Design a protein with these regions (language model features):
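Glycine-rich, aromatic-bearing surface loops/beta-hairpins
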Residues: 22-25, 145-150, 155-175
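Bacterial N-terminal signal peptides that target proteins for export
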Residues: 1-8
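Bacterial Sec signal peptide processing site at the extreme N-terminus
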Residues: 14-40
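Short beta-strand and strand-turn-strand segments in soluble, beta-rich domains
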Residues: 91-104
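Exposed aromatic-hydrophobic patches
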Residues: 115-122
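Short coil-to-beta strand junction motifs in C2/discoidin
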Residues: 62-71
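Short amphipathic, basic-aromatic surface patches that mediate peripheral association
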Residues: 49-61
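A short, solvent-exposed beta-strand micro-motif common in secreted/extracellular proteins
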Residues: 127-138
């Protein structure tokens, strides 16, 4: 009987200590919602874009460089981005992209010969692609859209976004 009582006492003390530790963690998360809960591998992917606009980007009719407005999108698939024209995408983005649009991550104007960091963006669940749409003045000649593959969970990705004369490029930075 003494053994059973001793075992019971040890079990109750162990549960009490575990409850205290759990309560402390819950308090920490409530007091600071930015605290990570869970391992890195199960956290949403974060993506940053280091954007550089070339000195000769987006030349106007007088040959002078002009700012470029870029929009960053989180997508489950990029097939619709490459199927529609610029104005169909930008004028009614949610309707045109439908369920493939996981999130519109934002729009930014980038001036010629400048560097700017976009993000970090936390990707929503189901994101398979990051796409960039760039508003070049001559949309007929320019390569104004690009995309790259991403995972929606467990990564912290850095991309180089190059805004060249008449072309937008998105390149994953390794390392």
């Amino acid at each position: 009987m003494k053994r059973l009582a001793g075992f019971f006492l040890v079990a109750v003390m162990g549960l009490s200590l575990a409850a205290c530790e759990t309560s402390e963690k819950i308090y920490d998360v409530i007091s600071d919602p930015g605290i990570q809960v869970g391992a890195d591998e199960v956290q949403p992917t974060k993506v940053s874009l280091q954007a550089y606009a070339a000195a000769d980007v987006n030349k106007n009719f007088e040959g002078e460089a002009s700012p470029v407005v870029v929009r960053v999108l989180a997508l489950s698939s990029d097939h619709r981005v490459f199927s529609y024209d610029y104005f169909s995408l930008t004028d009614s983005m949610e309707k045109t992209l439908g369920s493939t649009l996981k999130a519109d991550l934002g729009e930014t104007m980038i001036k010629p010969d400048t560097y700017q960091v976009l993000g970090p963006y936390e990707l929503p669940e189901g994101t398979k692609k990051i796409a960039v749409i760039a508003e070049y003045l001559d949309l007929e000649k320019a390569v104004w859209r690009t995309s790259v593959n991403v995972r929606d969970i467990g990564d912290n990705d850095q991309f180089l976004l190059l805004l060249l004369d008449e072309e937008v490029r998105l390149v994953k930075q390794e390392g």
